[in-house]
C-alpha cells in the first residue's frame, strides 16, 4: 500500500540537519581540537587530559554516527556538546584531583569554555548518556550513573533557580535596591544597596553548603533563606526598608515588646516557628565562625533605630555586620568561603543565580521530566488523569505563575503570587499540622482490624513498616554527599531523616485505617485477612506514603523512582494503589494529588513497559502468545527481595522491631508469587473501590463486582469467578491497557489539536493506537507511549494523503508539556538475526529509523485495514460522513469521553463562569492583539498591569448593579461539542470540511523551542 510507505527523506525530516556523516579525517580533527582546548584554554593537568582523551576516543565512533541527534544538529554545535559532556563525566567519574589545585574543573568552567548554558546542557546530556552508557560502564564501572549524580545536580539547579527568584521577590518587597537618600554625615562612599542583596544570597549559599549539606530539600533550604531575610531585616539600614514595621500588615504578629519578627515571617512564608528559630541560630553561628562578628549582649541596646518596635526575643544583632566600612570585607570573606567549598569535582557556581543576566543560565525550563515541581501545570493537566479519582472536584486552579513583562514570573500585586516555593511550603504545612501530630503506632481501631484477621498481623505489619521505611530513610541516602567541615551536619541529617520517616509512617497508618474502615462497611465484617496479609500491597502503600513525604519536602537525593528500588517493587505495582490511596485520604493537598497524577502518567507512559517490570509477569499469563517475545527480550521481573535481604542490604537494625516468626503465614508474603507468576492462589479479596473504571478493552463487559485493588495483588493465574472465568492476570492487564488507551487518547487529542488535524484523522489515529494496544502489544515493550503515537499520526497522515511531514509532527510534539527530546531521538530496538540492515542485538535509533524498520512492518496490516475506508476526494468524504463507514472498512472506535471541558459557574451570587484553557487558545493568547480578549486567573491581560487590577475591574463590574441586556448561552458547550471541535477551533470558516482543515492549515515551521 502506497499510503503506508515510509517517508522518502527520513532523518532530515526530524532533525533538519544535514547528512550527519563525518569522514575519518574529520574525526581526527575533532580529537586535535579537543586536546588543544583541554591543554591551552582550560589548562588541565596531564592526568585529567589523558582520561578525557581516552573517553573522547572511545566514544568518537558514536559521535560520528550521531551528528544529528544533539542540539540544533549542526556539526559544530554537536562537537561542543560532546566535548563538554566528556569533560563533565571525567570530572565526576575520573581519578583526577578534586580541587582546582589538583587540576580539577568545575561545570561552570566547562560551560564557558564551550559557550553553552545550563539549560541546554541538561536537556542534551541524557541523550549522551544513553548513547555512551556502555563506554562509561566499561571505563568507570556499572554504577557510573549513580556516581555521575546528573539528576541530583539538575534538580539542585532547579531548586536554586526557584529559590533565587523567591529571594529576589522577597528582597524587593522588603528593601530598596537603590539608596535614594544616602547618609549625609558619611565620609565613606555609600555602599551600594545591591551589595546588601549580594550579601544575603552569599550568606544563604554558604549556610546551605556548610549546614544543610550539598543536596538538601527545598523546604529546608527555604527555611534557611527566610532566616537570612530575618538577619537582613535586623541589620540593613532603616532608610532602605520598603515597609514601616509599625504599620505593615506583613508583620502582624506582636507582643508587649513589639513586633514578633519570627512569628510574622512564619505566617508570611508558611514556615514553622521551631524550624525557623533553628535556622536563624545556625545562621548566627555561621556569622560568628566565618565573619568573626561578635553578637551584642543586648540586641535592643546595640541598635535602637533598626530594632525599634521589634521584640528582640530570639534575635541576635551583630555590630558592624552590614555597616559601610565592613560590608565589603564581609562580602569578600563570604566569597572566599564559598569558593573554597565549591572547588570540588564538577561543582556549579551558584552565585550566578543572583545575576539574571549571566549567560550560563540560558532560558527555558528544567523542571519537566527531571523533577516534578508543584504548580507548573494547569488544571487541565490534572483533569486529564487516566485515573478519575485523582482529579480535584474544584472548578479551576489558577496558574502557579503570574505573567510579567520581564518574564520572571512575579506579580506586581501586593499579594504574594503562588510559586513553586510557596506551594511547597504550604504543602509542608499540611504535613506538619495534619500528619505530624498523629501517633507513630497503629491506632486502637487499626489494631482491631489487625487482630480480627485469621492470624493477628500486627507484628508483621509493624516490622515490615520499620524495615521498608528504614531502607528508604537512611542517613546515607541524604547525607553521604556532604562536602563541608561542620561536624554537626551528620547529626542534623540524621534528625531530619528520622522526622521524615515518622511522617511517612504516620501517613501510611492513617490511609491504611481509612481503607480498612471503608472495606468493613462494604463487607459488613472485620476480617480483612486477604488484604492485610499481602506483602506487595503493604510495600506499595508504604512506598506511596514515603514518596508523598519526599515530594512534599522536594528532596533531591531521593527523587522518584528511588522508592521503588528501596522497597523492592516495580512501577506497575505502584500504579495499582495510587487511585485508592488518593481516594482514602480526603485531606491530601491538591499539589500532592497532582504529584501522584504525574507519577501515574510516568508509570503508564514508559516505566511500566521497562525491562524488569512486574507487568510482564502478568502479561505473559494474560497473553500467552507474547511469551516468546517477552522471554526473548528478557523482560520478566526478578523476585521481590525479602524483608531480611532489604534489612541486611541497608544495615537496618532490627532492634525494637517484632521478631520474624519461624513459619510464614500462608496468606502473607508474595514470595512464591514473585518467583513464579503462575503460583496458585487461595486468598480471597475484598472490595475497596468502585469498579466502573475497571474495563478491559478486550472484553465488552466485565461482569466482576470486584474493583481493581480487589484482584490487583492476586496471583496472575488465579481464576476470577466473578468475571466470567477470566484470570486475575487478564483482569489486571485489562485495567492497565484501558488506562494506557485513555492516556493515549489524551495525548492524541492534544497533539492533533496542535497540528490542527480534523476530527476524522484524530479518530483514525486513536483507532490505530487502540488496535496496536490490543493486537500488537509488543510494540510498546521497552518503549515510550509517545513513540507509538508519533508514528501512528504519521502513518494515518500518509494513508489520509495529508501533506504532513514527520518534522512538523515533531515540531508540534516539542511544544507539548510532556515532551522529552530522547523520546524521538532514542527509540529502543532489538534487531533480530534476520534484520535487513545486518545489525543484531539491542540498539537505540531515531524515530524515523524505528518507523521505517520496525513500526511499518508490524503495523502495515492495520494501516491497510484502516485505510481501506479512506476517501480519495471531498465527494467521497462527504458521502462517508453521510452514510457512515464503507462496508468493507472496520468501524472506527469512537473517541472516548474525556474530562469535562465545559465552563463552570464559580459564584452562586453572580453569573461568572470559568473554563479550562485549551492548547489552541493558549497559543492564541501569545498574540498581544488577541490576549486582551481573554481574562486568565492570576495572569494580567495588559502589559505592566498586575492581576489584582484585572480582578478589581471584574469585581467592580459585578458589583455595580448594572444589568446586562443579553445572556451568554453556555448550554451548547458540552463534552460532545468539545470533542468534535478539536480541529476547527481556530478555523476561519465553520463550514469548512474536515479535509479542507487538514490540508489547508499547514504547521508553521519555526525553530523548535523545546
Curated annotation (Swiss-Prot):
<dbReference type="InterPro" id="IPR002720">
    <property type="entry name" value="RB_A"/>
</dbReference>
<dbReference type="GO" id="GO:0030154">
    <property type="term" value="P:cell differentiation"/>
</dbReference>
<dbReference type="InterPro" id="IPR002719">
    <property type="entry name" value="RB_B"/>
</dbReference>
<feature type="compositionally biased region" description="Basic and acidic residues">
    <location>
        <begin position="664"/>
        <end position="679"/>
    </location>
</feature>
<dbReference type="Pfam" id="PF01858">
    <property type="entry name" value="RB_A"/>
</dbReference>
<keyword id="KW-0805">Transcription regulation</keyword>
<feature type="region of interest" description="Disordered">
    <location>
        <begin position="657"/>
        <end position="679"/>
    </location>
</feature>
<feature type="region of interest" description="Spacer">
    <location>
        <begin position="620"/>
        <end position="730"/>
    </location>
</feature>
<dbReference type="InterPro" id="IPR024599">
    <property type="entry name" value="RB_N"/>
</dbReference>
<feature type="region of interest" description="Disordered">
    <location>
        <begin position="868"/>
        <end position="898"/>
    </location>
</feature>
<dbReference type="GO" id="GO:0005667">
    <property type="term" value="C:transcription regulator complex"/>
</dbReference>
<dbReference type="GO" id="GO:0000977">
    <property type="term" value="F:RNA polymerase II transcription regulatory region sequence-specific DNA binding"/>
</dbReference>
<keyword id="KW-0678">Repressor</keyword>
<comment type="function">
    <text>Regulator of biological processes that recruits a histone deacetylase to control gene transcription. May play a role in the entry into mitosis, negatively regulating the cell proliferation. Formation of stable complexes with geminiviridae replication-associated proteins may create a cellular environment which favors viral DNA replication.</text>
</comment>
<dbReference type="GO" id="GO:0005634">
    <property type="term" value="C:nucleus"/>
</dbReference>
<dbReference type="Pfam" id="PF01857">
    <property type="entry name" value="RB_B"/>
</dbReference>
<dbReference type="GO" id="GO:0000785">
    <property type="term" value="C:chromatin"/>
</dbReference>
<keyword id="KW-0539">Nucleus</keyword>
<keyword id="KW-0131">Cell cycle</keyword>
<feature type="region of interest" description="Disordered">
    <location>
        <begin position="1"/>
        <end position="23"/>
    </location>
</feature>
<dbReference type="GO" id="GO:0006357">
    <property type="term" value="P:regulation of transcription by RNA polymerase II"/>
</dbReference>
<dbReference type="InterPro" id="IPR015030">
    <property type="entry name" value="RB_C"/>
</dbReference>
<feature type="region of interest" description="Domain B">
    <location>
        <begin position="731"/>
        <end position="861"/>
    </location>
</feature>
<dbReference type="InterPro" id="IPR028309">
    <property type="entry name" value="RB_fam"/>
</dbReference>
<protein>
    <recommendedName>
        <fullName>Retinoblastoma-related protein 1</fullName>
    </recommendedName>
</protein>
<comment type="similarity">
    <text>Belongs to the retinoblastoma protein (RB) family.</text>
</comment>
<feature type="region of interest" description="Pocket">
    <location>
        <begin position="419"/>
        <end position="861"/>
    </location>
</feature>
<dbReference type="InterPro" id="IPR036915">
    <property type="entry name" value="Cyclin-like_sf"/>
</dbReference>
<dbReference type="Pfam" id="PF11934">
    <property type="entry name" value="DUF3452"/>
</dbReference>
<feature type="region of interest" description="Domain A">
    <location>
        <begin position="419"/>
        <end position="619"/>
    </location>
</feature>
<keyword id="KW-0804">Transcription</keyword>
<dbReference type="GO" id="GO:2000134">
    <property type="term" value="P:negative regulation of G1/S transition of mitotic cell cycle"/>
</dbReference>
Amino acid at each position: 500500500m502506497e499510503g503506508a510507505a515510509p517517508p522518502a527523506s527520513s532523518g532530515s525530516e526530524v532533525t533538519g540537519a544535514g547528512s550527519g556523516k563525518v569522514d575519518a579525517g574529520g574525526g581526527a580533527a575533532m580529537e586535535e581540537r579537543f586536546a588543544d582546548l583541554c591543554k591551552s584554554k582550560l589548562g588541565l593537568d596531564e592526568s585529567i587530559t589523558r582520561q578525557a582523551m581516552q573517553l573522547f576516543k572511545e566514544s568518537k565512533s558514536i559521535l560520528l554516527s550521531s551528528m544529528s541527534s544533539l542540539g540544533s544538529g549542526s556539526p559544530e554545535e554537536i562537537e561542543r556538546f560532546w566535548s563538554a559532556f566528556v569533560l563533565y563525566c571525567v570530572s565526576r567519574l575520573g581519578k583526577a584531583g578534586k580541587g582546582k589545585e589538583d587540576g580539577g574543573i568545575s561545570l561552570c568552567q566547562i560551560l564557558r569554555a564551550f559557550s553553552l548554558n545550563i539549560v541546554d546542557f541538561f536537556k542534551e546530556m541524557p541523550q549522551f548518556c544513553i548513547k555512551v552508557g556502555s563506554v562509561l560502564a566499561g571505563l568507570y564501572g556499572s554504577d557510573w550513573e549513580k556516581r555521575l549524580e546528573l539528576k541530583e545536580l539538575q534538580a539542585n539547579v532547579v531548586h536554586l533557580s526557584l529559590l533565587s527568584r523567591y529571594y529576589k521577590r522577597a528582597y524587593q518587597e522588603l528593601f530598596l535596591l537603590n539608596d535614594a537618600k544616602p547618609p549625609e554625615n558619611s565620609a565613606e562612599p555609600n555602599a551600594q544597596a545591591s551589595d546588601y542583596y549580594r550579601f544575603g544570597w552569599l550568606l544563604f549559599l554558604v549556610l546551605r553548603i556548610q549546614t544543610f549539606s550539598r543536596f538538601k530539600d527545598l523546604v529546608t533550604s527555604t527555611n534557611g533563606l527566610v532566616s537570612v531575610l530575618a538577619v537582613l531585616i535586623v541589620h540593613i539600614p532603616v532608610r532602605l526598608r520598603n515597609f514601616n514595621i509599625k504599620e505593615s500588615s506583613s508583620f502582624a504578629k506582636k507582643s508587649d515588646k513589639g513586633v514578633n519578627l519570627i512569628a510574622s515571617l512564619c505566617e508570611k512564608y508558611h514556615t514553622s516557628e521551631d524550624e525557623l528559630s533553628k535556622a536563624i541560630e545556625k545562621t548566627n553561628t555561621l556569622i560568628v565562625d566565618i565573619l568573626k562578628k561578635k553578637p551584642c549582649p543586648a540586641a535592643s541596646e546595640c541598635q535602637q533605630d533598626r530594632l525599634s518596635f521589634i521584640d528582640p526575643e530570639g534575635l541576635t544583632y551583630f555590630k558592624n555586620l552590614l555597616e559601610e566600612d565592613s560590608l565589603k570585607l564581609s562580602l569578600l570573606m563570604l566569597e572566599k568561603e564559598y569558593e573554597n567549598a565549591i572547588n570540588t569535582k564538577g561543582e556549579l557556581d551558584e552565585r550566578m543565580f543572583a545575576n539574571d543576566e549571566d549567560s550560563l543560565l540560558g532560558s527555558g525550563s528544567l523542571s519537566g521530566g527531571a523533577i516534578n515541581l508543584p504548580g507548573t501545570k494547569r488544571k487541565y493537566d490534572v483533569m486529564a488523569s487516566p485515573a478519575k479519582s485523582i482529579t480535584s472536584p474544584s472548578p479551576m486552579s489558577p496558574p502557579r505563575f503570574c505573567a510579567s513583562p520581564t518574564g520572571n514570573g512575579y506579580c506586581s500585586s501586593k499579594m504574594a503570587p503562588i510559586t513553586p516555593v510557596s506551594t511547597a511550603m504550604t504543602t509542608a504545612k499540611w504535613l506538619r499540622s495534619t500528619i505530624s501530630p498523629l501517633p507513630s503506632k497503629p491506632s486502637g481501631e487499626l489494631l482491631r482490624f489487625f487482630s480480627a484477621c485469621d492470624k493477628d498481623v500486627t507484628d508483621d505489619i509493624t516490622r515490615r513498616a520499620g524495615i521498608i521505611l528504614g531502607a528508604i530513610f537512611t542517613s546515607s541516602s541524604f547525607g553521604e554527599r556532604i562536602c563541608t567541615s561542620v561536624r554537626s551536619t551528620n547529626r542534623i541529617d540524621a534528625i531530619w531523616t528520622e522526622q521524615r520517616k515518622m511522617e511517612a509512617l504516620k501517613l501510611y497508618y492513617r490511609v491504611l485505617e481509612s481503607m480498612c474502615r471503608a472495606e468493613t462497611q462494604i463487607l459488613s465484617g472485620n476480617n480483612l485477612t486477604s488484604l492485610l496479609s499481602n506483602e506487595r500491597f503493604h510495600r506499595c502503600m508504604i512506598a506511596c506514603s514515603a514518596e508523598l513525604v519526599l515530594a512534599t519536602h522536594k528532596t533531591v537525593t531521593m527523587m522518584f523512582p528511588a522508592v521503588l528500588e528501596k522497597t523492592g517493587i516495580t512501577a506497575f505495582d505502584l500504579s495499582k494503589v495510587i487511585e485508592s490511596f488518593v481516594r482514602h485520604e480526603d485531606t491530601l493537598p491538591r499539589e500532592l494529588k497532582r504529584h501522584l497524577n504525574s507519577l501515574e502518567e510516568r508509570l503508564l507512559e514508559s516505566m511500566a513497559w521497562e525491562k524488569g517490570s512486574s507487568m510482564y509477569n502478568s502479561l505473559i499469563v494474560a497473553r500467552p502468545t507474547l511469551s516468546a517475545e517477552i522471554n526473548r527480550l528478557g523482560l520478566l521481573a526478578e523476585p521481590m527481595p525479602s524483608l531480611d535481604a532489604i534489612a541486611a542490604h541497608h544495615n537496618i537494625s532490627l532492634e525494637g522491631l517484632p521478631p520474624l516468626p519461624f513459619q510464614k503465614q500462608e496468606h502473607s508474603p508474595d514470595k512464591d508469587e514473585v518467583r513464579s507468576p503462575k503460583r496458585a492462589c487461595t486468598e480471597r479479596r475484598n472490595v475497596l473501590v468502585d469498579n466502573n473504571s475497571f474495563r478491559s478493552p478486550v472484553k465488552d463487559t466485565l461482569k466482576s463486582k470486584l474493583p481493581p485493588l480487589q484482584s490487583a495483588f492476586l496471583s496472575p493465574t488465579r481464576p476470577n469467578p466473578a468475571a466470567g472465568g477470566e484470570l486475575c492476570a487478564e483482569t489486571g492487564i485489562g485495567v492497565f491497557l484501558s488506562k494506557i488507551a485513555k492516556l493515549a487518547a489524551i495525548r492524541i487529542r492534544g497533539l492533533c489539536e496542535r497540528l490542527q488535524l480534523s476530527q476524522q484523522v484524530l479518530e483514525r489515529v486513536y483507532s490505530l493506537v487502540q488496535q496496536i494496544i490490543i493486537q500488537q502489544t509488543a510494540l510498546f515493550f521497552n518503549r515510550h507511549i509517545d513513540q507509538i503515537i508519533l508514528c501512528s499520526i504519521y502513518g494515518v497522515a500518509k494513508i489520509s494523503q495529508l501533506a504532513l511531514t514527520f518534522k512538523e509532527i515533531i515540531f508540534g510534539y516539542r511544544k507539548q508539556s510532556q515532551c522529552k527530546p530522547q523520546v524521538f531521538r532514542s527509540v529502543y530496538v532489538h534487531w533480530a538475526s534476520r534484520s535487513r540492515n545486518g545489525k543484531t542485538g539491542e540498539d537505540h535509533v531515531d524515530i524515523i529509523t524505528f518507523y521505517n524498520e520496525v513500526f511499518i512492518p508490524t503495523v502495515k496490516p492495520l494501516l491497510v485495514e484502516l485505510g481501506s475506508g479512506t476517501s480519495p476526494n471531498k465527494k467521497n468524504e462527504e458521502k462517508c460522513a453521510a452514510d457512515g463507514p464503507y462496508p468493507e472498512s472496520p468501524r472506527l472506535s469512537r473517541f472516548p469521553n474525556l474530562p469535562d471541558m465545559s465552563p463552570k459557574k464559580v459564584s452562586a451570587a453572580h453569573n461568572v463562569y470559568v473554563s479550562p484553557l485549551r492548547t489552541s487558545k493558549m497559543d492564541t493568547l501569545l498574540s498581544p492583539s488577541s490576549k486582551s480578549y481573554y481574562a486568565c486567573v492570576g495572569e494580567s491581560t495588559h502589559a505592566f498591569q498586575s492581576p489584582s487590577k484585572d480582578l478589581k475591574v471584574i469585581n467592580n463590574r459585578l458589583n455595580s448593579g448594572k444589568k446586562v441586556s443579553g445572556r451568554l448561552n453556555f448550554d451548547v458547550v458540552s463534552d460532545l461539542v468539545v470533542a468534535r471541535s478539536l480541529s476547527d477551533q481556530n478555523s476561519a470558516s465553520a463550514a469548512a470540511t474536515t479535509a479542507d482543515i487538514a490540508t489547508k492549515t499547514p504547521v508553521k515551521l519555526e525553530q523548535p523551542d523545546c
